[in-house]
Amino acid sequence: MIDEILFEAEERMTATVEHTREDLTTIRTGRANPAMFNGVMAEYYGVPTPITQMSGITVPEPRMLLIKPYEMSSMQVIENAIRNSDLGVNPTNDGQVLRVTIPQLTEERRKDMVKLAKGKGEDGKIAIRNIRRKGMDQLKKLQKDGDAGEDEVQAAEKELDKVTAGFVAQVDEVVARKEKELMEV
C-alpha cells in the first residue's frame, strides 16, 4: 500500500512537471516555435479546432514560421484566429501559406515574460507540494488505521520528501532554462 501511494505521487508529480514544461512553451520568446500556436483555436466546420491540427507549421528561419493549411478553404479562418490571438503576431497570406514573422521582444516585454514564466513555475511547484501533502495524509491514515508501522511510514515520508525535492528542482530547472531563453537577445 505504501509503495502504491509513493508510485501514484511520483506519477502525478511527473505529469505536473510535464504540464509546467508545456505551459512554458506557450510563452513567446522572440524565436519561432510552432508550440506557440498550441492554444490558438479556429472555427473548422463549426467546431473550434486547434490550428496545429488544421495545418502544418514549419520553421524556415529563426524568426519566421510558415503555416500551410491542409485545406486551402481554411486559410482565412486560420489567419483570423492568429490575428485575434494574444500572441502579438501578424500573419501575411501569399495564397499558399501564411508567413508569421516573430518580432524581437523589447527588454520590458522580456522581463514581463520572465515574470510570467516564474509564475507558471511557482504554480507547478505548488501543485507538486499539494501532491506531497496528499501522499503524506494517506501515509498518516495508513498508520492510524494500523495498516502500516510507524517506522515504515517515517521511511516512506522521507522518501516522499526526497522525491518532492527532486521534482521541485526539475521545475526550477525548466523555469531557469526558459528564463535564459527569454533573456537572450
Swiss-Prot record:
A biological-process GO annotation: translational termination
Alphabetical UniProt keywords: Cytoplasm, Protein biosynthesis
Lineage: Bacteria, Bacillati, Actinomycetota, Actinomycetes, Mycobacteriales
Keyword Protein biosynthesis listed: yes
Protein name as it appears in the record: Ribosome-recycling factor
GO MF annotation list: ribosomal large subunit binding
Example of a GO cellular component annotation carried by this entry: cytoplasm
Protein role: Responsible for the release of ribosomes from messenger RNA at the termination of protein biosynthesis. May increase the efficiency of translation by recycling ribosomes from one round of translation to another.
Similarity section: Belongs to the RRF family.
Keyword Cell division: no
Gene3D superfamilies registered for this protein in UniProt: 3.30.1360.40, Ribosome-recycling factor
Organism annotation: Corynebacterium glutamicum (strain ATCC 13032 / DSM 20300 / JCM 1318 / BCRC 11384 / CCUG 27702 / LMG 3730 / NBRC 12168 / NCIMB 10025 / NRRL B-2784 / 534)
Places the protein is found: Cytoplasm
Superkingdom field: Bacteria
Pfam families, per the entry: RRF (PF01765)
